[in-house]
Amino acid sequence: MIELRNLSQRFPGPGGWVEALRNINLTIPQGEVFGIIGRSGAGKSTLVRTINLLTRPTEGNVVVGGRDLTMLPAGALREARREIGMIFQHFNLLSSRTVFDNVALPLELAGASRAEIDAAVLPLLDLVGLSAQKDRYPSQISGGQKQRVGIARALASQPKVLLSDEATSALDPETTRSILDLLKRINRELGLTIVLITHQMEVIKQVCDRVAVLDAGRVVEEGRVIDVFLQPHHEVTRALIGDVIAQELPPALKARVAERLKTGRGHLLRLAFTGSGVDQPILSETIRRYELDFNILHGQIDEIQGQAFGSLAVLAGGEPGKVGQALAFLREQGVVVEELSYVE
């Protein structure tokens, strides 16, 4: 549905050219919720704005629905953009227009009749849960409701793609969850492709199918959300995941473990379980089979897209040969094993 091919974006800056995007290649299938995450300044907003050519790339191609937007003349590009809705961190509602009239605005600009507007807007207000607020003004509704108006307005032209640029970053956690639930419902019921920009891994965890991690204008990691959580490879990804699931021991515990490792022998491991592995007695079976001592230092169980996910930090002790066999056994059971340190 969406293909970004060798995409680069440069801007002139005070000290020379700024490389905002560097050779981005992404493919987003139709109907997927795709997350793009990174710290501030990573190039996320620049990237999402190239998808509808609000920002035209310096190099590369943007293909949406089989059409290369970078090659379209102005009139055809305007037509293609009607199939791409967009919501922002700031709601950009017109204070002098009611909720209904804000949602109706794109249709009015497209020359739709009043009957066509009514037929389109009323179901959208029902979809986003604002039927009872249709005659209110932006000053009379909450921040979460304003974002729902923004979503309904973005859907008014019946787009096939919805771009979300930090749409929940100004909202409280409870409202954020409700907006993300709404986006999942829209994706499910309308078959809409959603590209979601955020700096919060919690948002990615809750709603996205796949994710790309952006750093300094480059995609440094990409994959299914569950896989990226299980085995993050890049240090930026590890830091972002650490905001949601602890990747390291708390400092005080880490210091105590370091002291213990100095006086003996042991393996400090991080074990990650997913799916049915979370519910199985894999660890106790490993202990019995290989006569090991496992000291659980730190643990967490969470859920990613309805799939259970567990992470444990353990200190393993036993005969070196049996420890190696145990780690191989754990991997055979689908456990992701990461050796954090080994002290003889």
From Swiss-Prot:
Classification via SMART domains: AAA, NIL
PROSITE patterns named among the record's database cross-references: ABC_TRANSPORTER_1 (PS00211), ABC_TRANSPORTER_2 (PS50893), METN (PS51264)
Any GO MF annotation of the entry: ABC-type D-methionine transporter activity
Family according to the record: Belongs to the ABC transporter superfamily. Methionine importer (TC 3.A.1.24) family.
Protein's name according to its UniProt entry: Methionine import ATP-binding protein MetN 1
ABC transporter domain span: 2-241
Catalysis performed (reactions): L-methionine(out) + ATP + H2O = L-methionine(in) + ADP + phosphate + H(+); D-methionine(out) + ATP + H2O = D-methionine(in) + ADP + phosphate + H(+)
Membrane topology recorded in Swiss-Prot or TrEMBL: Peripheral membrane protein
SUPFAM superfamilies: ACT-like, P-loop containing nucleoside triphosphate hydrolases
Subunit structure: The complex is composed of two ATP-binding proteins (MetN), two transmembrane proteins (MetI) and a solute-binding protein (MetQ).
Enzyme Commission number(s) from the entry: 7.4.2.11
Record key words, sorted: Amino-acid transport, ATP-binding, Cell inner membrane, Cell membrane, Membrane, Nucleotide-binding, Translocase, Transport
Highest taxon above the source species: Bacteria
SS bond list: none
GO cellular component: plasma membrane
Cell inner membrane keyword on record: yes
Function: Part of the ABC transporter complex MetNIQ involved in methionine import. Responsible for energy coupling to the transport system.
Binding of ATP, residues: G38, R39, S40, G41, A42, G43, K44, S45
Gene3D superfamilies assigned to the protein according to its UniProt record, in alphabetical order: 3.30.70.260, P-loop containing nucleotide triphosphate hydrolases
Database matches in PANTHER family: AMINO ACID IMPORT ATP-BINDING PROTEIN (PTHR43166), METHIONINE IMPORT ATP-BINDING PROTEIN METN (PTHR43166:SF30)
Subcellular location: Cell inner membrane
